[in-house]
């Protein structure tokens, strides 16, 4: 009885460990996707400033 109880507890811990690892990997992927989206937003927010700068330079030299 002790051996089977030990085996059940051991397998439960292994299963829990695997689930935690998968959860951690999923969270890391989600965080990477959020980081990518925030980078895209930052770059897109720079576009109007770049356009204004180009147009100002064109007016200055044009």
Curated annotation (Swiss-Prot):
Residues 1-19 form the signal peptide. The modification Phenylalanine amide is found at residue 61. The keyword Transmembrane helix does not apply. The keyword Chloroplast does not apply. GO terms for cellular component: extracellular region. InterPro entries: Frog_antimicrobial_propeptide (IPR004275). Keywords: Amidation, Amphibian defense peptide, Antibiotic, Antimicrobial, Cleavage on pair of basic residues, Secreted, Signal. GO terms for biological process: defense response to bacterium. It is found in: Secreted. It comes from the Eukaryota. Expressed by the skin glands. Has antimicrobial activity. This is Phylloseptin-Az7. It comes from Pithecopus azureus (Orange-legged monkey tree frog).
């Amino acid at each position: 009885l002790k051996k089977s109880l030990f085996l059940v507890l051991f397998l439960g811990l292994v299963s829990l460990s695997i689930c935690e690892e998968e959860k951690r990997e999923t969270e890391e992927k989600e965080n990477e996707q959020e980081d990518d989206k925030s980078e895209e937003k930052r770059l897109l927010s720079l576009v109007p400033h770049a356009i204004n700068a180009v147009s100002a330079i064109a007016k200055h030299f044009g």
